[in-house]
Each structure stands twice: as C-alpha cells, then as structure tokens.
Design a protein with these regions (language model features):
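Active-site/ligand-binding-proximal alpha/beta "capping" segment
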Residues: 197-247, 251
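Short acidic-hydrophobic, aromatic-tinged amphipathic segments that line or gate anion-handling sites
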Residues: 10-14, 80-85, 175-185
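RNA substrate-binding interface of SAM-dependent RNA methyltransferases
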Residues: 50, 109-110, 114-203
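Glycine/small-residue-rich loop that forms an oxyanion/phosphate-binding "nest" at active or ligand-binding sites
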Residues: 73-104
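Boundary-proximal intrinsically disordered activation/regulatory segments immediately upstream
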Residues: 1-70, 156-157
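Amphipathic alpha-helical repeat scaffolds
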Residues: 41, 130-138, 248-255
Length: 269
C-alpha cells in the first residue's frame, strides 16, 4: 500500500539537524556544499525535478505543508522529507518571505571538453559578472539560443547562488557551466581553435557585421567596468551592439541575450 504524501513527512524541530544545517550553509554561502545546492520555492523544485536532478532532502515549513501533496508524488521515496516549524524553516532559507519548501539537489558537474564537443560551439564567457540577476539572465538566454554553455571566470558570482538560480528560471540546472581563470580560459579556447569576441560598448565590429558562423566564445564583462582590459587586448575580436546616444551601455544580461540572438540568427540562415 502506498504511503500518502504527508505521511512521508518527518517532523524536525531542531535547528541543529544535519539537513537543516546543510541547507542553511548552502543558502548563506551561495555555493555547493558537499555536492548539493539549496533551492527554494515550488517552481524551482519542479524545474529541478523536470531536469532530472537527484535530491538529498526536501523540507516543508508547517505553513507550507500543503505543497507536500503536489511535490512528494514527483519525488523518489528515498529522498528524505522533513516538516519544519516555520521559525526553523525561516532560519535555514535566505528569502525575506519564505516560500514554504526548499530542497538540497545534487548538481551536475561539467568539464571543459563538454563545451567544445560540437563542430561549431557557441560559448558565453561571464568575465567577472557579479550581479546574480545578470548571470541568471545569461544562463536563461544561453539555453534559449542553444549556446554550448558558459565559462565563469574569477570574480563571477556562483551559478548556485539562490538569486542566480531564481533569475535563470531553472536554466542553471540544464546549461553546462565551467569555472576557469581567465588565462586558462583563453589558452583552452585557442587550443580548440575557438575565436574569442569581447563585447565592448564602443569601437567594435557591429554584431550584424561580425561572422558568428564558426566556433565562437563571446566575452561579457561585469556591470560597471565591462570586460577587463587585459582580456579585451588578448581577445581575437571586439564586437559591439549598435545603440543610440547618449546611452553608455546595456546591462550584461541584456547585452548577452542580444548577441546570442544575433549569433543564432546568422547560424540559422
């Protein structure tokens, strides 16, 4: 006889419970802890399930217990299911207004070679992107426009930061991401004969006139300073998005989306 969803819930009242502590650490650090990242909210958890990610545990707040009926039917019985008092749940998550459900999901690790395994890969490089919303948008656009994946250089926010996960609308679970230092990244791309194009605000080749047909890596810099000068100087090309004066530049997420759209448009012709 099958167990009813709510009967699977185990009541835990201690903030020192191992799962509660791991959830808190992962949210507070914005990083993977022991191979798992913390995610919150019904939509994000269903995206993780849809993406085939494995879970260590799922936690419901007492006030969010009703969500168990919907979610536990989608999750293996091997996954621990905890019911937490509202104050214990709130102490573990990072949102100001907790959404009543959070989970520890096992992340997929991608290697650099996965980025170059197609004949003409299109790769996005996040060069020091610090705003979680921008990185989330870049991940979402990378999936939408069929980029091979993202390379995250030093000083880039973690893709497992809770705000990045939310902004990506689940794309972070499916898009390949690899962390590399800038010199290593350039050497890797050149070794695989992938042209590098640094996005600049002015004095670059207009993206409509640039040839994206071959293997290409597009470098997008952070919100304030743009692509670091040393990377611009070492990149094969400089590209820019035509825009009206006196606008100085677009934000990193929008710029990446426009460039990926143009690259995909050219490749589909």
């Amino acid at each position: 006889m099958e167990t009813a969803p709510r009967e699977r819930l185990r009541l835990v009242s201690s903030r020192q419970n191992a799962i509660v502590k791991q959830l808190r650490r992962s949210f507070s650090q914005g990083e993977v802890v022991e191979g798992y990242c913390a995610i919150e909210g019904l939509r994000m958890i269903e995206e993780a399930i849809r993406s085939g990610l494995k879970m260590r545990a799922i936690c419901f707040s007492k006030s969010g217990e009703v969500k168990a009926e919907r979610l536990l039917n989608q999750i293996s019985h091997n996954v621990e299911a905890l019911l937490l008092p509202d104050d214990v749940f709130s102490s573990a998550v990072e949102t100001e207004h907790p959404q009543g459900v959070a989970a520890l999901v096992k992340v997929r690790q991608s290697g650099p070679d996965e980025l170059v395994s197609s004949s003409a890969p299109l790769i996005l490089v996040a060069a020091g992107i610090q705003d979680p919303g921008n990185l989330g948008t870049m991940l979402r656009s990378a999936e939408a426009f069929d980029a091979r994946g993202l390379i995250l250089t030093e000083k880039t926010v973690s893709q497992w930061n809770a705000k990045v996960v939310r902004a990506s609308a689940g794309s972070v679970f499916r898009v390949r991401t690899v962390a590399m230092r800038s010199p290593e990244m350039l050497e890797f791309l050149r070794g695989h004969k992938i042209q590098t194009a640094a996005a600049v605000a002015r004095n670059g080749v207009r993206i409509q006139e640039f040839n994206f047909a071959g293997p290409t890596a597009v470098l997008i810099g952070n919100e304030g300073a743009g692509v670091p000068k040393e990377l611009i100087n070492r990149a094969d090309h400089r590209i820019c998005i035509p825009q009206a004066e006196p606008l100085e530049s677009l934000n990193a997420g929008i710029a990446a989306s426009i460039i990926l759209y143009e690259a995909t448009r050219q490749r589909s012709e």
